[in-house]
Every structure is written in structure tokens, then in C-alpha cells.
Amino acid sequence: GEARENIDADGLALMPGIIDNHTHYDAQITWDSALSPSPALGVTTAIIGNCGFTIAPCRPADRELIMRNLTQVEGMSLDVLRQGIRWDFESIPQYMAMLDRQGAAVNIAAFAGHSSLRTWVMGEQAPKRAATSAEVQEMKRLLHEAMQAGAIGFATSTSPAHNGEGTDDAARAWFT
């Protein structure tokens, strides 16, 4: 059949939207739902939570530690994070609900981050020692909860911030 509308694209360029599969917009999205400058660069989908560094789950007492992780890994300004992050969530389901309520200029997909899960369960000990079996079980439970809330998976890296040793043993234990 015939199209309802024809668009004259003569002299124009057309491209599909870009999926930015490695972003660290987890904090920025709380104060900049436009995710500047991504949309201007053709990004239509951003995947957040990469490398295991996320801002949820996070108890109020752990906010400073979570923000310091971002300054170490991402080179973000601690002052900007302190002034910018709108902490109207603690759990990953609450963070995902906040993303839905607020909306964004692009589609968002979020990983559950290893570092934040460890911090939620282990507090300041998270980067200093290996997790106990009970702590790993609690992190697995939180990961399941995150997946039920819409997280697309689990993100980690070999950063010492995840387990104190910089090895993948702790993450590997989650899937056995």
C-alpha cells in the first residue's frame, strides 16, 4: 500500500539512534534528565551502572562512600556529586521507580552494580575484605530484587573497590 506521509529527505542524512552501552550517568541522571550531551550526539539509549559503580542501593550513611567511589573511578567532582545527586531513593527498586517517574531524554537500561551491593551489605568494610558466605547470599538476594525491578543484569570489574583484592572470585561465586 501507499504511505500515509512521504517525507522529502533529499540532501539529508538518516541514521538509526545510537545505543551508548557504557555510560556512568547513574548520578547525573538525578539532576540532568537530558543526559547532556548524549542526545545531541545521536544517542537514543544509554546503559547505566557499568563497571559495578552505581548509586543504588545506598543508605544515607553510605552516600559519602558511594560518591567517593565515583570520584575515584570516574574522576567526577565530589562537590558536584554532593550538590547534584537527588537522593530520593535507597533501594534499586526505588531508584528504578525514580527513573520511571522522572523520565529521561533517552531510553535508559540499568545494571545492578557490584560495588553498591557490597556497600549496602558490608558498609565501609566492602572494599577492605572478602565477603562472607552470608553476605554473598544477601547480595544475591538484592541482585534478584534488582532484576525483578527492571535491572538488565549485574555489572562488576576487577576493581579492588568491589572486593578488596581486585579478583573476580567474589563475583564468580554469585553464579554458582
Where in this protein do the model-derived segments appear?
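Histidine-rich, glycine-flanked metal-binding segment
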Residues: 1-17
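Short low-complexity, flexible loop/linker segments enriched in glycine and/or proline
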Residues: 7, 60-69, 168-173
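Divalent-metal coordination cores built from histidine and acidic residues
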Residues: 31-153
